[in-house]
Amino acid sequence: MKSTNISRSFSKIKKEKRIALMPFLMAGDPDLETTAKILLELQANGADMIELGIPYSDPLADGPIIQLAASRALSAGTSPDRVFKMLFELRDQLKIPIILFTYSNPLINKGLEEFCWQASKVGVSGLVVPDLPLEEAEKLSDIAESKEIDLVLLVAPTTPKDRMKKIAATSNGFTYLVSVTGVTGERSSLEDNVGSLVQQLKDSSSSPIAVGFGISDVKHIEQVREWGADGAIVGSALVKRIANASIEMKVEEAGSFCKELRAATN
């Protein structure tokens, strides 16, 4: 596998005999100034990589918690350009990989080349586009790779086995294994078949595997680790904690939750 910021991070974490903690944060919820502080707080409290959502008005893969966060961020005037500006200002302070989570529409509106160029300029290491089918991934993957950005592809429990192998072989940085059928959101338990899917992916690709959608507490992180995955992505649970905290406590709440989750990674 090609050496990139993300692959080097996974290699380092593997040597430490633990899994990667990969929190998801919606950019601009409640505002970009707070997002910037939370990014640094997550880094300080053990996040290995951060998935940063670009808000979009029709987020098909997301459940109500992240949909509401996107809506609040859009109401606050968040746009891809403003997210890039914030990341540029943080570039010297952020030492861990930042992975942008964006739907196809904002990418197409800006132009694939322009989006990837701006992302690389501000230090972005990866890109996740949940509504991008495998058949349309090659062009974006090539553009992203030329800017040293990994295009990460998603595999779901309903993905046929042959297609799963193709996705894992095409995905760069890691393969994003969706742990549930349906949209993002907190779950009380994870689906039993995810462990066997992790093994299937391990058998067909050397790419690291990160499990996301529904990962919301220490118990889930431990489960993901037991399955043999390489990383756990925690989204809705963190977004909810930030939303429920007072404006003065949002940054601290994000940091303390991250610290709690990080302790379960080894």
Swiss-Prot record:
What domain of life does the native source organism fall in? Bacteria
Pfam families assigned to the protein according to its UniProt record, in alphabetical order:
Trp_syntA
Which InterPro entries does the UniProt record give? Aldolase_TIM (IPR013785), RibuloseP-bd_barrel (IPR011060), Trp_synthase_alpha_AS (IPR018204), Trp_synthase_suA (IPR002028)
Ranges annotated as spanning the membrane: none
According to the UniProt entry, what is the EC number of this protein? Answer: 4.2.1.20
Q: In which pathway does it act?
A: Amino-acid biosynthesis; L-tryptophan biosynthesis; L-tryptophan from chorismate: step 5/5
Q: Which GO terms describe its molecular function?
A: tryptophan synthase activity
- Which PROSITE patterns does the annotation name? TRP_SYNTHASE_ALPHA
The EC category is lyase
Q: Which reaction(s) does its UniProt entry say it catalyses?
A: (1S,2R)-1-C-(indol-3-yl)glycerol 3-phosphate + L-serine = D-glyceraldehyde 3-phosphate + L-tryptophan + H2O
Q: Name one GO cellular component term.
A: cytosol
Q: Which residues form the active site?
A: E51, D62
Instruction: Give yes or no: UniProt keyword Amino-acid biosynthesis.
Output: yes
- Subunit structure and binding partners: Tetramer of two alpha and two beta chains.
This chain's function reads:
The alpha subunit is responsible for the aldol cleavage of indoleglycerol phosphate to indole and glyceraldehyde 3-phosphate.
Entry similarity comment: Belongs to the TrpA family.
Q: What is the name attached to this protein's record?
A: Tryptophan synthase alpha chain
In its UniProt entry, the species of origin is given as: Prochlorococcus marinus (strain NATL1A)
Gene name per UniProt = trpA
